[in-house]
């Protein structure tokens, strides 16, 4: 019998699906959570990459401010639906960014991760839009109030995703 060691491959697929789902719900939340993680747990896979900016603490702070601003702006009556093409494109790009950065950090293909993240973000956009509008119509609850619940789900989901990631080293400070 052979004595072989099984090589443990770092998780790539499911974390991207998680981050991209966040991007479909709130476009800036996924990059904010991922950059927060990378700023505390830098990965050699991003060294020398155009995506290395995601590891900078200033990037993490700026993305958190933008994510908070998006959550406020989402409740305004003039905010367009997430499924119109320009807004949908932003969510696709956000999902592609987190997918590419995560795959690259795990020494994978940034292109493959970007495609996966972008497609998952688009799917999550349509699902979350249908859920939000459906809940609002079925319960006669204002869409903005349902949006507050969606914000809570995004924050809780992002925090759970970060806690679930296998940590490479050092002390972890979730938020």
Show where each model-derived region lies.
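Short amphipathic, positively biased membrane-proximal segments
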Residues: 1-175
């Amino acid at each position: 019998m052979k004595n072989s060691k099984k090589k443990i491959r770092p998780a790539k697929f499911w974390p991207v699906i998680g981050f991209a789902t966040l991007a479909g719900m709130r476009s800036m939340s996924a990059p904010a959570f991922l950059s927060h993680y990378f700023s505390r747990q830098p990965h050699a896979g991003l060294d020398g990459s155009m995506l290395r900016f995601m590891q900078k603490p200033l990037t993490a702070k700026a993305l958190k401010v933008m994510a908070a601003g998006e959550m406020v702006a989402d409740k305004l009556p003039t905010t367009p639906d997430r499924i119109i093409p320009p807004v949908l494109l932003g969510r696709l790009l956000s999902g592609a960014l987190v997918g590419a950065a995560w795959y690259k950090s795990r020494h994978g293909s940034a292109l493959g991760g970007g495609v996966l993240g972008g497609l998952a973000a688009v799917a999550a956009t349509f699902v979350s839009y249908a859920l939000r509008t459906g809940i609002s119509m079925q319960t006669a609850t204002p869409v903005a109030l349902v949006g507050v619940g969606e914000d809570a789900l995004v924050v809780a989901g992002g925090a759970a995703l970060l806690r679930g990631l296998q940590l490479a080293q050092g002390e972890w400070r979730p938020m």
